[in-house]
Amino acid sequence: MLFNINEKGEPLVISFAPFLSPEAIKHLQENERCSDQSQKRTAQQIEAIYTSGQNILVSASAGSGKTFVMVERILDKILRGVSIDRLFISTFTVKAATELRERIENKLYSQIAQTTDFQMKVYLTEQLQSLGQADIGTMDAFAQKVVSRYGYSIGISSQFRIMQDKAEQDVLKQEVFSKLFSEFMNQKEAPVFRALVKNFSGNCKDTSAFRELVYTCYSFSQSTENPKIWLQENFLSAAKTYQRLEDIPDHDIELLLLAMQDTANQLRDVTDMEDYGQLTKAGSRSAKYTKHLTIIEKLSDWVRDFKCLYGKAGLDRLIRDVTGLIPSGNDVTVSKVKYPVFKTLHQKLKQFRHLETILMYQKDCFPLLEQLQDFVLAFSEAYLAVKIQESAFEFSDITHFAIKILEENTDIRQSYQQHYHEVMVDEYQDNNHMQERLLTLLSNGHNRFMVGDIKQSIYRFRQADPQIFNQKFRDYQKKTEQGKVILLKENFRSQSEVLNVSNAVFSHLMDESVGDVLYDEQHQLIAGSHAQTVPYLDRRAQLLLYNSDKDDGNAPSDSEGISFSEVTIVAKEIIKLHNDKGVPFEDITLLVSSRTRNDIISHTFNQYGIPIVTDGGQQNYLKSVEVMVMLDTLRTINNPRNDYALVALLRSPMFAFDEDDLARIALQKDNELDKDCLYDKIQRAVIGRGAHPELIHDTLLGKLNIFLKTLKSWRRYAKLGSLYDLIWKIFNDRFYFDFVASQAKAEQAQANLYALALRANQFEKSGYKGLYCFIKMIDKVLETQNDLADVEVAAPKQAVNLMTIHKSKGLQFPYVFILNCDKRFSMTDIHKSFILNRQHGIGIKYLADIKGLLGETTLNSVKVSMETLPYQLNKQELRLATLSEQMRLLYVAMTRAEKKVYFIGKASKSKSQDITDPKKLGKLLPLALREQLLTFQDWLLAIADVFSTEDLYFDVRFIEDSDLTQESVGRLQTPQLLNPDDLKDNRQSETIARALDMLEAVSQLNANYEAAIHLPTVRTPSQLKAAYEPLLEPIGVDIIEKSSRSLSDFTLPHFSKKVKVEASHIGSALHQLMQVLPLSKPINQQTLLDALREIDSNEEVKTALDLKKIESFFCDTSLGQFFQTYQKHLYREAPFAILKVDPISQEEYVLRGIIDAYFLFDDHIVLVDYKTDKYKQPIELKKRYQQQLELYAEALTQTYKLPVTKRYLVLMGGGKPEIVEV
């Protein structure tokens, strides 16, 4: 029930429907099932929309309408009396939040239109108005709100900023690291610290590897609930726990025993084959069979009696026994077919080999790890202290501050918990533990609504942990009192051809071990409508593989990259789709796993005339050729003795010196100087005093004179003009901006150059001046291996899309090509010198000196890199986590398709059959095989091989070079031009002619009334003043910038410690202060400070206000005393609107504005306006604002029918307040 007030001030009572009971929900589900609607909601969607009063986890498969469910649930909450501002709604991205807000807005508009109840219309309109302020956004955005509001409770200023530029973060990190490193190198424990650094960097002079270790540990800790506690309690967890054989986890022992038993079983299956040859010709057992039987029996016995025969303490002995028992090779051959029976067991034995030796040396590395722990803790504290001093933070800092505020302030936490009716989270599978902690603190324990799909968790590199979702899923299924699980399985996006192949692939591939979830009936995709089940034979999924048996060398030098032949296969299929099926290019999307090596795709498509749009590559703005040329030009202007920059400038198209020219210049050396720079040689060459003046011919001399004259001009201008103007002078003097327009990718190149000028302008606006500072900033960015954001140019709409799989998440496309399926998964992380784990902490490779173990006496040391036991445990978990994420990445890619999916790769046709043992061992591919295969393509081929008797809903085809000839690929069909002899074309031409006549008439009408067309409906006095101002004073031409949105892409690192206060902000604050200042009290500093607290401005602006000057106005001027004497007649910040007639078009328009102050008496009016402009003589401002005050006076006269007898300007921009009568 809600109370509103009607026009008479009487209360209106709105009665809302109660939330639905479980019985009512079942009744609604039945009604929906029996209804004749074309698009019905599923029973699970209805349950997810209307269930209330408990925690709910919605597991929403791809295309199941999760956004629809969220919007409908939010609307239902609103219709049942829950205000939108009482819902916390978290989305993964800002874009998702914007789309969700728009959908809610459209729903509210629709509901208002349908509602006949006046009271409900008023309520829904209020909800619509509140939508902009509702908590719908990312967790980062919400955390910023909390810290801005309550940061004072933990000593954090509300006036902070976010360091979004990685370059700025790296510069600060480097400063903190260097200082701390120096301190640790000179402390008491310095020898241990040096050993730590050498373990990772090899020596103490090169600290890059150790610095990477520290940064990674710091970054990893930031994703935990409490970084400091994690570093103190969990960082060395595995190092403290796993020190003996007995400490090895039972799970790892079980995996070893399982591998032994599986090997025995597989070997038995092989020996039972008809062609194996158990018996000799004489009828006795063959030697091979006898040996294999012994292996089978012993492996089975050791597995069965492990605890009695070995136990954990005897694990090292077991490893030696098994290693001695089985052959060194992996395969058993039967009838020329190789079966990799022993491969998995060999891999497991390798993991446990040399355990005793490793454990013996592992204890020596513990002091090093303690030093590392101390360093990372100290780094975290010092880095945070610097950020607090700068009042500039990373997003993770702000979230941790928000968590700290809620944990340490019970009243604040309870106020949020009481305020939010429900805490809703989208993409829950991609949350990390820091975000989970924040959500827990906001919830009252039974009002969480979480939507996600663990099969689409693909952001592990952002420390997202799918196990958060998984744990909730298990808990709610086992303990229903904790919450409810609702499965959305129906897919409303894809045709059955896509759904069937997805189910076939992942039912054989995904389980808890690899993928983190068993792909069973609970998770399989089901068509949501009958139309999706209509079969299309030509849309069957295709695995198209370029046969690399006779590779023509088209593959890139890195074997991981996509080859020209693979791209040609894609081009051929697209041409076929476009020509034969009429599929528009924008319906086709190419998905790749990374942005690297995509240039070959664009190049090949250009050859075939296929338009393509990419989502961008790695940030390479500063490495683009045109920008590098300009940067070297600026470096040369700053310091001509920089040989590298000077050579780059001379070789650039601006001056076009060739190798011969440079060689001749280089020989003009002064023999008396040891070091001679190129610039000096040029100067000597020009005056003929070089070592070989005869080499400088007239043409070269002319070029050198032009260069020196131009450079001198630029250097002189750099001292006087702005960076922006200098860059444009370079463009214009040497026509470089025009030159790049004639090159490939001209639009992008010109946009890059334009952006450079804008970035230079922004740099100077931020308070820095000069060429040297700008170059230094750019070089700092490059030193930290970073770059500036790329410049986006308008892309064609009718084009094939190329994007990463990550970028495609949440989107859908009719036809999807998954490219480079033969690319190996990146396993770089599992080969690093350290591996981090949330539970186990850090595991490292230890550089041990085994000189004593070997009995070596001649060498000083014998260093061996050992994988410590914690490292091995973390490595195994990381390997499985990596494979699981790659599997989910494939799921995301496949489920983007609406109609058809293609897999593109390359393989040797003759060797592709050797991928797997075709013996079917169950519903899933064997775990060992899934761990062994490291490409999408290998997974698909293994499934096709092992489950060949099933319909897997995809075909495997090998493409030969003969299939990729120009004739075989074909060409795009272009639309036929109009035939003037065709009557239909002639009729169409007549229609176009009539349309052109109509356009001509409209154009003439527009010309006649051009002044009225361009006349704004509403204008302000400031706009009218601007029309007169150019006639009154000389002004400069401002720099044209496209839009504020484009400028945001060009943000430079913010190194300034002081926030620059704009003059407009000071003026706005002064007007607010003069509005709220109580004139009934004596005007003094205290009165002004009290009033200052009430205005809505940041602290920097408030500090910039000169309160003494304001006090002087009221105390020392007659007008200020007039304010206090006649305060009852005073009106402040008064809006007005009058009708005016434009003198040119004679059309009427509305003039609106706000008058700072006026005094209304019985027979006259006194007008006052405050100005904070800087000035030399008051007469300047009198002329500038005379027209504006006349408009104000006219408005007051029209309104009150009284004359304005006095008009005053109060000038606050000088040394003291001055009053000017206008």
Curated annotation (Swiss-Prot):
Q: Which Pfam families match?
A: PDDEXK_1, UvrD-helicase, UvrD_C
Which GO BP terms sit in this record? double-strand break repair via homologous recombination
- Cofactor(s) annotated in UniProt: Mg(2+)
**UvrD-like helicase C-terminal domain: residues covered:** 524-810
Question: What are the UvrD-like helicase ATP-binding domain coordinates in residue numbering?
Answer: 39-495
Which one of the record's GO molecular function terms can you name? ATP hydrolysis activity
Reaction it catalyzes: Couples ATP hydrolysis with the unwinding of duplex DNA by translocating in the 3'-5' direction; ATP + H2O = ADP + phosphate + H(+)
Q: Which domain of life is it from?
A: Bacteria
**Entry-linked SUPFAM superfamilies:** P-loop containing nucleoside triphosphate hydrolases (SSF52540), Restriction endonuclease-like (SSF52980)
Q: Does the keyword Aminoacyl-tRNA synthetase apply?
A: no
Which Gene3D superfamilies does the entry link to? Answer: 3.90.320.10, P-loop containing nucleotide triphosphate hydrolases (3.40.50.300), PCRA, domain 4 (1.10.486.10)
A Gene Ontology cellular component where this protein is annotated is: cytosol
Which residues bind ATP per the record?
A: A60, S61, A62, G63, S64, G65, K66, T67
**Keyword Signal appears in the UniProt entry:** no
Q: Which HAMAP family match?
A: AddA
On subunit structure and binding partners, the annotation says: Heterodimer of AddA and AddB/RexB.
Q: Which family does it belong to?
A: Belongs to the helicase family. AddA subfamily.
Q: What does this protein do?
A: The heterodimer acts as both an ATP-dependent DNA helicase and an ATP-dependent, dual-direction single-stranded exonuclease. Recognizes the chi site generating a DNA molecule suitable for the initiation of homologous recombination. The AddA nuclease domain is required for chi fragment generation; this subunit has the helicase and 3' -> 5' nuclease activities.
The name under which this protein is listed is ATP-dependent helicase/nuclease subunit A
| UniProt organism field | Streptococcus pyogenes serotype M12 (strain MGAS9429)
Q: Which gene encodes it?
A: addA
